[in-house]
From Swiss-Prot:
One of its GO terms (molecular function) is ATP binding. HAMAP family: Arg_succ_synth_type2. Keywords: Amino-acid biosynthesis, Arginine biosynthesis, ATP-binding, Cytoplasm, Ligase, Nucleotide-binding. L-aspartate binds at T131, N135, D136. This is Argininosuccinate synthase.
Amino acid sequence: MTTILKHLPVGQRIGIAFSGGLDTSAALLWMRQKGAVPYAYTANLGQPDEEDYDAIPRRAMEYGAENARLIDCRKQLVAEGIAAIQCGAFHNTTGGLTYFNTTPLGRAVTGTMLVAAMKEDGVNIWGDGSTYKGNDIERFYRYGLLTNAELQIYKPWLDTDFIDELGGRHEMSEFMIACGFDYKMSVEKAYSTDSNMLGATHEAKDLEYLHSSVKIVNPIMGVKFWDESVKIPAEEVTVRFEQGHPVALNGKTFSDDVEMMLEANRIGGRHGLGMSDQIENRIIEAKSRGIYEAPGMALLHIAYERLLTGIHNEDTIEQYHAHGRQLGRLLYQGRWFDSQALMLRDSLQRWVASQITGEVTLELRRGNDYSILNTVSENLTYKPERLTMEKGDSVFSPDDRIGQLTMRNLDITDTREKLFGYAKTGLLSSSAASGVPQVENLENKGQ
């Protein structure tokens, strides 16, 4: 069976991921007029720029949908976001600033929950607004087929008939008006924005050019911290984790993770925390550029990693970072539910996150400028008395350290012999001016 349909399957049910924007509105109306039976599915991901979710399915019905459903994905989205924090599943960083994979997390939830809803309605053909150059077309493809093995894919934006008739936003707007819908195009921005309650992505258009900076972006989850006229007073915030799970902010305990994330967004957003400018590698190996917001994710991530470094040993922390980067890349590629990702998630949540219990107090200032004021945990292996510089009882003596250093002579001797071997073969210069250790020929020392 052909998985991807190049032309409209007339007379068949087609599920469309319906945002209510111009593109999906025109596509739904066009499919109905051409003889398909469209079903509209809208994901409530807690998008910060969406004012009225309930109105979206109503508009879909007006445009010809056979049925329209609003699927609440917020609880699952936050659960996956917390899992990503527990695992450090982030692989794109620039200058210490992290992209929190908020769009890939949203696609993992949308791609599974919407297709599951379609399957309930007997809809086995799915369309969405992703383009052939981006990451989402592959993410949705993978998650859709994982959820429904019988799924077929139809995308109007890959159908030459649709493109010939309605190839641009102006043509789509004229089409809607001609069909009796007073649909006016929204004012064109200098970039495109996609968001969910974990974060926002700003990309394309002017932002494709690296001389266009973050300063052209109007944040939807934070503030213009780079604008000196924007007053941002410093603020102390306390974050508490229990067994790797964020449970309290500023002493207020949350039983609802969605409400906790919304409050974390409000706190971090007041300062512009978690905003970053990234050049990344798309799934197809081409580079793209995005400016990201994720105030709540950033706040939780900072507190989580502070506890992590005080609780776990060096090798565990190293594995957390290495496996987290690997898992972040799998998430980015649309493989969040693949076996290799599940294996990494299980080990990180079981052996790392389970011990993260405690409280971190931060002072937030402008943007990503913050200070850690206090760290408290019953699981801390950081114990200042072990290494205090003050006189008193110690867990080891000067003689103990002399013995430990003496044992280092073995590997120091081995390393020195290797350096001499490298110099002998020309890989290293024996001159101290080269910036490498000066290698002395011990064999000829007595001559």
